Amino acid sequence: MKIFVGNVDGADTTPEELAALFAPYGTVMSCAVMKQFAFVHMRENAGALRAIEALHGHELRPGRALVVEMSRPRPLNTWKIFVGNVSAACTSQELRSLFERRGRVIECDVVKDYAFVHMEKEADAKAAIAQLNGKEVKGKRINVELSTKGQKKGPGLAVQSGDKTKKPGAGDTAFPGTGGFSATFDYQQAFGNSTGGFDGQARQPTPPFFGRDRSPLRRSPPRASYVAPLTAQPATYRAQPSVSLGAAYRAQPSASLGVGYRTQPMTAQAASYRAQPSVSLGAPYRGQLASPSSQSAAASSLGPYGGAQPSASALSSYGGQAAAASSLNSYGAQGSSLASYGNQPSSYGAQAASSYGVRAAASSYNTQGAASSLGSYGAQAASYGAQSAASSLAYGAQAASYNAQPSASYNAQSAPYAAQQAASYSSQPAAYVAQPATAAAYASQPAAYAAQATTPMAGSYGAQPVVQTQLNSYGAQASMGLSGSYGAQSAAAATGSYGAAAAYGAQPSATLAAPHRTQSSASLAASYAAQQHPQAAASYRGQPGNAYDGAGQPSAAYLSMSQGAVANANSTPPPYERTRLSPPRASYDDPYKKAVAMSKRYGSDRRLAELSDYRRLSESQLSFRRSPTKSSLDYRRLPDAHSDYARYSGSYNDYLRAAQMHSGYQRRM
């Protein structure tokens, strides 16, 4: 017969001692001492009953009365009570005796500063919670409430594995007051934040990707540039759609971009420019004005070239755009509404007085007086965009288009290009004439001005007959009489001419530092001479940002600088300067192929400690190179073309063994 002996201190009670206690009442078969109780098996039932009668309440140790009773099978369901804020001085036996006054305690376990007490009956558990919650035990007020698990299942009612995924809040059939999920530990009730005694609240379901969502890519705050207040962003960007910049440039508020960017007038010249049948200008430029009617007529009637441009502003380039418009990439990169010559919001007309014509009476192309007799580009009667048809058939006022100009258009100008005064093209200081002949003339540019059909237009842009000595056009004027003319001037005399510049549109941003006529240096190396090859610009639209509208800085700033300084100012500085600690360039005599080295450099995913310079101190000289790599993004510097490790290894050889390896060893930074 199995006898339960409770209130036993298992630390100082041995099974032999307990067996000797029960031996006088019968044969003791076995004795097992647990932490706080013991089991004694006796052969005879009568002896067991006598032992229970005699030993119940016996003090085996002073102050510890034994609880001796017939052993009963563990109840299938016990009520689990959570006891929080338990003092470290409180033992499990003391806590058990505290709860046993309210009912039978099946189990009592103290875990650090909290405990779990299992009681047999629900009524006893509720009574114990009501009476003991907030009671001070050993100097601490204990927090007593029903555990979130609520009811402990016996072995016959073991929780099925599928119940672990049971919906929160489904409820427990045996104890409806608690939530249906079974959490190992309730944070709310453990820290005393529970609101009710038995209304165990189901914890909210975990967000689906909580464990994954700690990625810095998704959790970090957005970049400051994206969340800048609307007022901090330039109105240029504020009004633009994300894909096309064209329509936005036309709709930009005039407050941010100045007068020059206000919507252009819709004039006959604008329509004629867009509708030109020219081979080169027709296709790319005709389709670039999405909605010409949207241009307001409030701007001046200067036409496409000079639409509402500030007359005497020191605009730095072709585009003549204000400094605030530096965001406009280039002639060609601008959106569809800005790409064409005729549709530029501010162009030839906005150049300062020191432009091509250098006319005191006219500050720029567009603002030249109609009485001016100079036939040069800058001194035409009115301007490209706004000249009347009766004037010297200038750019904007030609009969139908570039191709359809009458042959007398340029010839009829009162003074040919070559006959201009000392300020003409050929005699300008550091003017087009001084430029080298590297760039092709206008006529040879693909899809540029010079690509216009040559036959129907004697006075057309690109292919005017060379016979006419009156500077028939920009592109193909006779080379001998007009060394400073725009187009087909001889390479020696007019290499810097309009045509030799590889088209305005094809110039990179760093080349057109100064206005065409007002460059102060005697050498134009930093100007037209440094322009890209004409094939680099198939048309205006394909250009990278050039100085005409990308720089947007007033020409006065450029005029005060030398050409070299301007080129340095416009060129991008190198990303970093090589020092002794810079990573070596990949050598050509590397036994490992350069592609392999590059793939290792780009494909490796090493931690910062492995990237640092002290990897060179490793015992194995090539261990880092031969180590396997992982594939992930690499944000280190690009591989260099040459190795300069050997150049720096001389001072290291005395005390750094790793520096003696061959020069192709890749030091990773």
From Swiss-Prot:
Gene3D superfamilies: 3.30.70.330. The modification Phosphoserine is found at residues 161, 220, 242, 244, 256, 272, 280, 520, 523, 527, 562, 582, 618, 620, 623, 627, 643, 649. One of its GO terms (cellular component) is cytoplasm. SUPFAM superfamilies: RNA-binding domain, RBD. The modification N6-acetyllysine is found at K164. One of its GO terms (molecular function) is RNA binding. InterPro entries: Nucleotide-bd_a/b_plait_sf (IPR012677), RBD_domain_sf (IPR035979), RBM14_RRM1 (IPR034506), RBM14_RRM2 (IPR034507), RRM_dom (IPR000504), SRSF (IPR050907). Keywords: Acetylation, Cytoplasm, Immunity, Innate immunity, Isopeptide bond, Nucleus, Phosphoprotein, Repeat, RNA-binding, Transcription, Transcription regulation, Ubl conjugation. Transmembrane segments: none annotated. It is found in: Nucleus; Nucleus, Nucleolus; Cytoplasm. Residues 307-354 are annotated as: TRBP-interacting domain. Residues 147-175, 193-232, 284-303, 566-592 are annotated as: Disordered. Residues 287-303 have a biased composition (Low complexity). The modification Phosphothreonine is found at T206, T572. Interacts with NCOA6, CITED1 and XRCC5/KU86. Interacts with SS18. Interacts with STIL and interferes with its interaction with CPAP. Interacts with gamma-tubulin. Part of the HDP-RNP complex composed of at least HEXIM1, PRKDC, XRCC5, XRCC6, paraspeckle proteins (SFPQ, NONO, PSPC1, RBM14, and MATR3) and NEAT1 RNA. May function as a nuclear receptor coactivator, enhancing transcription through other coactivators such as NCOA6 and CITED1. Regulates centriole biogenesis by suppressing the formation of aberrant centriolar protein complexes in the cytoplasm and thus preserving mitotic spindle integrity. Prevents the formation of the STIL-CPAP complex (which can induce the formation of aberrant centriolar protein complexes) by interfering with the interaction of STIL with CPAP. This is RNA-binding protein 14.
